A protein has these predicted regions:
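Core nucleic-acid recognition elements
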Residues: 1-201
């Protein structure tokens, strides 16, 4: 069973939300955004309900700083969530899983996290897209579903064959840039030139 909890900084400590609200208003010029709230969402599997509840105030949150919720507050706000791409290391999830394991003295649970943004104000579709584009770094993250999954176990298709590249070490600067674009690589020209020199020997 998957257990879910939302954690939000108390208003007087919500510096991240206040800073992002300021950025959106000043940099994106979206004055119609009146308020912004940020929640850290934790989905946990392979633990008991008793252990999950025990960890609410010790692992997931700090009672003096945070508010916790079993469900998102009901509002008329626009809500979206952001999670790491599959394969990206999630430091928050890993630390959480390790802490739960220490508390339970048992097996390490499966933990997935996401950041949930709650936007208040009348936002046009184009404004919402601009905010999402500002918040979501496509190299490492993506928009997440708001629904709770049945399981956190994910089956990935393992490729039966891997493409072999030929002529990589002979590419010139323009061809290297085209190579980066073609494969959507998370590196700049200097990075790939270093790789080319390395393999060229």
């Amino acid at each position: 069973m998957v257990y879910r909890i939302y954690v939000e900084k108390k208003k007087q400590f919500a510096d991240e939300a206040a800073s992002l609200l300021s950025d959106i208003r000043s940099l994106l010029m979206i004055d119609s955004l009146e308020e912004l709230r940020i929640f850290n969402r934790y989905d946990v599997e392979n633990i008991s309900e008793e252990l999950f509840e025990c960890c609410e105030k010790t692992v997931f949150s700090e009672p003096q700083l945070d508010n916790t919720y079993a469900r998102l507050p009901q509002t008329d706000a626009t809500v979206f969530a952001v999670e790491y791409l599959p394969g990206q290391f999630d430091q928050r999830a890993d630390s959480c899983a390790q802490c739960i394991q220490i508390v339970s003295e048992g097996d390490k649970p499966t933990v997935r996290t996401a950041k949930v943004y709650m936007l208040f104000g009348k936002l046009a579709p184009a404004q919402l897209e601009a905010i999402k584009k500002y918040v979501i770094n496509p190299v490492e993250s993506r928009e997440a579903s708001l629904e709770k999954p049945e399981t956190l176990n994910v089956n990935y298709n393992i490729p039966t064959s891997v493409e072999t590249l030929t002529g990589f070490t002979e590419l010139n600067e323009n061809e290297l840039q085209a190579f980066i674009d073609k494969y959507a690589l998370a590196m700049d020209l200097a990075d790939i030139e270093f790789c080319r020199k390395y393999f060229k020997g």
